Amino acid sequence: MILKYLKQFGLVLLLFSFYTSKGQNNLTYEALISEASLLHLQKDYKNAIPKLEKAFSIEKPDALNAYKAAGMYSLDENKTKAFQYLDLSLDRGWTETDQLLIDPYFDFIRNNYPEEWKAITQKSHLKEQEYEKTLLLPELRKQIIAMGIEDQKIRYSKIQTSDPAQLNELQQKINELDFKNLSTAKEILKKHGWLKMSQIGKDGAHNFWLIVQHSDQDILFQKTALHEMEKLKGTKELDMENYAFLYDRVQCNLNYKQLYGTQVNWTQNGEASGFRGILKENETDKRRTALRMLPLKIYALNYGFNYTLPTASDVAKKDKKDKEDTLNLISLAKKYCVTKEFQKVYENYNNASMILGGMTSAQNFEAAELFAKIYNQTNEEQYRSIALDFLSLNHLRGDLNLKLLLSNTAFQKFYSESRWKNIVSSL
């Protein structure tokens, strides 16, 4: 399924979003482009091409959408249109030659028209060389773009196979690459702060953001990167849409509601079912407009679902229900604790913790203490593990007090556990 493809491939929708003009005001155009973008990912060129051409009759394509059109026409084995739109894409600012060289959408024209392909890639190289002369750190840009391409290549390979052994092998490679990229990104951030567009270009900055966005295994690093991004707010050195995505990503990773509606929910079948919880959701489009982002109803089309902005009354009702559901689940958990039905305690607290923006840091600590006491009675590892989960979340939020933690005798059996040591040593 295509939406499963989207989930596994990561943030592929935004892989080249830095080429897109943020000044588009025609929502009919934007809706057509969003629908075509989904079809582009499905390789459904028969349905994508009419939508793209209809959009282009309203407004001329920017670099990204000309590039997408070229890919669709290549899949359709329409040589003339494919090269026409590739040429236009380069004229409009496409600068990633390495991505062009490996893009599987262009296999048809690459393999069947070598002379024309050589000419277009030479033009791409020249355009990129001219672009690099305008940058302060062109070599670092090359390094970062290579990291981003490698990241996407291996994820693309994963979705092309259904063999369990190959999937396991590829997942291991993805994990290793993520760790490698994370280590490199940390070094870059420490040395340069958040990289400016004048240093590595829009494409380099976007690829660096993509690596950070994928670093969910190190939320503290994501928070640090976000802090560095914030230093550039209000300048022309930062893509504010990238900022919005990382801000929302960090918020959701800390179990808070997002602000800009960039994060979506996924079903077990890999389908995007809607947006994850948004703070004051009825005001989201105002916040997005301030960053020159498209309305949520248009953005949703990229994922294949329809969306209507709720009213303030609807939001108030939803927030009230979330709070009530959280409190009810916690109350049930405490009742089951009294009757020593510890598995039900676990299930209810786990469900409460899954409500975005539901549990406060104080409630997290209370839950950690309760599960520590259950572990002290049962010695069952799942209870110590979930206690540490709640403590880790508070630590990531910056809401964990070392003195208070060490003075609580319920956690004494945790002292030899590695996760406990990591938390305590970093406070």
Model-derived segments and spans:
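Canonical positions in the second alpha-helix
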Residues: 55, 89, 352-353, 394
